[in-house]
Amino acid sequence: MTFQFGHLQFCIENEHILLTGAQGFPLVGQSPFCEIQIAGEIKDSHLGIKMINSSEGRKLRYVSHLLEQNTLQIVQESDLVRATTTFTMHEDGNGVQISTRVTNIFAEPLVLEEVSAFVLSGFAPVSMAGQFQLTRFTQSHHTECQPLTDSLSELGLLDTCDRRQARVAFGNVGSWSTKEALPQGILCNADSQDSLLFQIESSNSWYYEIATANGAFYLYLGGANASHGAWSKRLCCGESYDTVSVSLAFGHGLNDLLANATRHRRHIAGKCAPDAELPSIFNEYMHLSWDSPSADATRIYAPVVSRLGVKYYVIDCGWHNEEDGNVIYPYVGHWRESQKRFPLGVRETTDYIRSLGMKAGLWIEPEIIGCKCAEMLEFYDDDCFLSRHGKRICTMNRYFLDYRHPRVIEYMTEAIRRMVEDYGADYIKMDFNQDCGIGTDRDALTPGEGLESHARAYLAWIDAMRACFPQVLFETCSSGGMRMDYATLSHFSIVSTSDQTSYLRYPYIAGNVLAAALPEQAAVWSYPVGTDTPGFTPTPEWVNANISDEQIIMNMINSYLGRIHLASHLELLSEHKLELIAQGIRYYDSMIPFKKQAVPYMPLGLCRFGNALVADRKSVV
């Protein structure tokens, strides 16, 4: 028996179900699309730590499938587990979201060591290693979304023998999901241009591999596992585990592929009413207040910003502590207003911002506590923190809160309520500036399981805050783009793409970012008076002599592909230069209806740092 779900073809025979085709990819081989390794069970392989030939993969027998308009659910069973894989598609594209639930149907407890969300088996014969290319995206501070393209043969997957240990494997370990790479990639047949984009929707550890089996290539997608991320999961009889979700999109060439991926992401992205019209945002942080805002400074900056047509004015880190900005971080965590910086209270300043016709925003780092924040260290019990071997994890003078603990939920919920109802926040920027590493072994079989459970609890809390305060716009940031994954982006409507401080370098990020995030989600800094040049002097004379019209215009253009985060010493600019920014805001506003439906078009393809051109106006059709 064969049947089709969207662009996927399945075949049921001999008590097994196989995926036999996907758009542009006539699959070869006879391998399962679900792999599950149980501790103590035989892994039918001598191939090192490759994820195929798991103890349960080929033992899974077809039980049933339920095909509805947008959803396909396939149930398979071995003697030990039931695997329920769910595929979800939408009518306006070919993207598909996939996840698997594993249930222990054995009489005794089992320990899962590896569970795929999905395996695309046989996407090309090994003989095509030279013409199939993988594009992955490296990440780092100030250099997000950088593509690297290699053929599978260049990556070492050669057509030599069928029992090879070689694999191409990429992943993340820790709470910054995208600190080294995006959890996505593009597979392309260079001859036909048939292409596939895959993404793993995990806000913490994740893993994928490409290797060979039975004379063909496979793509394994999932979260952490025992070998990568120190993850295992104990299931008692009747208990279940849900994998991360993954998504696939198909296309012919880069632009068609990204268009289909963009349409799919619009169905899974976070949305909220106050962000529906993609309002422009000014944030004091970049090239301005940094981590030392004050009521007096805001009264200087805000009147100028309000004249430009900006909708939100955000006060970033520093509104909440008495310590100086350069030493503030070891002391953060109570999230109460600074009497030194805001002697009349933060509410007096946010009310002033609203009196100018803008909405007000505040910053918070809700997942950490400074290691010198005595008040909160006394309030929280030891089991409120992520820990290993009974010791709290500490990075850069910060401890990490565990959102599985009700005391953490209670205090942080009150902190958000205080920011909204007492301090007048219409916008909350939620930052996360450190990585906790492999995870926590408190109340978990392994650190990877503890990290995953905490991360899911944190996102559930985010959903609760959005439900409690639907009038508030919540932004996610992680030292720029260090957590730019679609587990996170399915809970937030806007994400910071980078902390890049140079407007001359930002185009290399902005030029690629729509391959990773929606244009209506991807926030890009625009700092017309931003400069890393030594000798910067914050006076009108210096600024107007040294900040050119071209610099202002380029800063505005940098942000047009995504969401504008305006910043810097605008109050020092001449009326002529301010009018250039106002024109830029008006043009940004004019693009909003189009942007909400637009798909990427990359006339020169993906770009790299140092390219002479990111895009060419003459190439646009």
Each model region followed by its residue ranges:
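Short, structured beta-strand/loop micro-motifs enriched in basic residues and often containing a Trp
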Residues: 217-227
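Glycan-recognition surfaces
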Residues: 375-410, 455-571
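Polysaccharide-binding surfaces and accessory modules of carbohydrate-active proteins
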Residues: 1-212, 229
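Carbohydrate-binding surface patches
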Residues: 181-185, 190-194, 606-621
